[in-house]
Amino acid sequence: MSAAKPTTLYDKIWNDHLVHEAEDGTCLLYIDRHLVHEVTSPQAFEGLRTAGRKVHSPEKTLAVVDHNVPTTDRSKPNPDPESAEQIAALAENARDFGVTYYNEHDKRQGVVHVIGPEQGFTLPGTTIVCGDSHTSTHGAFGALAHGIGTSEVEHVLATQTLIQKKAKNMRVTVDGDLPDGVTAKDIILAIIGEIGTAGGTGYVLEYAGDAIRALSMEGRMTVCNMSIEGGARAGLIAPDEKAYAYLKGRPMAPTGANWDAAMRYWDTLRSDEGAHFDHELRLDAAALPPIVTWGTSPEDVISITGRVPNPADIADEAKRLSKERALAYMGLTPGTRITDIKIDRMFIGSCTNGRIEDLRAAAKVAEGKTVNGNVSAMIVPGSGLVKEQAEAEGLDKIFVKAGFEWREPGCSMCLAMNPDKLAPEERCASTSNRNFEGRQGFKGRTHLVSPAMAAAAAIAGHFVDIREWR
């Protein structure tokens, strides 16, 4: 009998959830976990209601309000009627269909990709979907997780399955140790800078190497979160003792004999030696600097010690024109030092960098300092539980004393779907995941950075090299 063919982590999870494969490669995949929020779910629930269908597995569905909620006083009505309507619809739909729901007054509420792991709803080896592109976050636990559209949300609600075609495998290995001041956010921005926003198209990425293993679970979530910005369907990291320690004792995690059985399965969730990857990429962690984006795409990355690039140096005409447009939108001049770029706003939060580790990093920078008088800076915890923990550690007092605003949890300024927005031509140092035109507000200018880099920029009034921060 021949030995089993070495298999990748992605292939293992896929094969364990494959219900049926048609001759053309179209597959029906079983879905273990479904996360739902207020923006992409109303039409899906209405479709069920119209057809007289129930939610197939309400116990495998978790709903939370996050995109549209204000991060200020929640005792007042939502100022935006459409947002208020979507929030009310989610509450009604969750009640009518028997789905667990965390509303804006529940301390378990927060950004959907923060609360999933926090509650132990996210587990290794599971398939997870959500009507949100940053569902890849959950891959940090060795889950196959990706975003879906509204029609697919309805399909999963009704059947607990999803029609898919299998992706290819790409492994990204980050060797060595990260220098001081360089973080998980810098790793993923460097990867996107290397492969571009289309480099991962058609792939599921597996992140590996000493630098990835050394990351905390929060750091791993940051890396997997932005897989979609590299064009990938999903991002994965093989689970290990760090993942198990994070999950053990969480409200929705298995207990007792079920935990032991789960652990036996989870320990098989790693790519076999000799498994085939369709593409491989290696980075040297020791060579990575703190990174800032300069343009309107996450691939527009540069070292904090660099200068704004000159599009005239780009041979490809289409790409040159694209970068010229980006520079014009961002109001930047080629050759400008990144450290000479002044900011108006600062945002720390989002499903990329709104966890307790991120807030601790920012507080370490902010302690004993004062926000620059020309900068408005806000800190938005990723969930009510993150907020509660930060306050127990006194981080909120550090921020408030330094002049940062301390807000309620939600998606906030990551996207312009709530009151937290940039005014036209305001420049923001942001820990979120997208710097597209208008992402944070009409004509707003976004620079993606790590939490420590964002906090330092807010205090200095311009970008600074966090490695030299005193």
Swiss-Prot record:
Listed transmembrane segments: none
CDD domains associated with the record: IPMI
Cofactor, free-text remark: Binds 1 [4Fe-4S] cluster per subunit.
Catalytic activity: (2R,3S)-3-isopropylmalate = (2S)-2-isopropylmalate
Pathway the protein takes part in: Amino-acid biosynthesis; L-leucine biosynthesis; L-leucine from 3-methyl-2-oxobutanoate: step 2/4
Subunit structure, interactors included: Heterodimer of LeuC and LeuD.
Protein name: 3-isopropylmalate dehydratase large subunit
Species this chain originates from: Rhodopseudomonas palustris (strain BisB5)
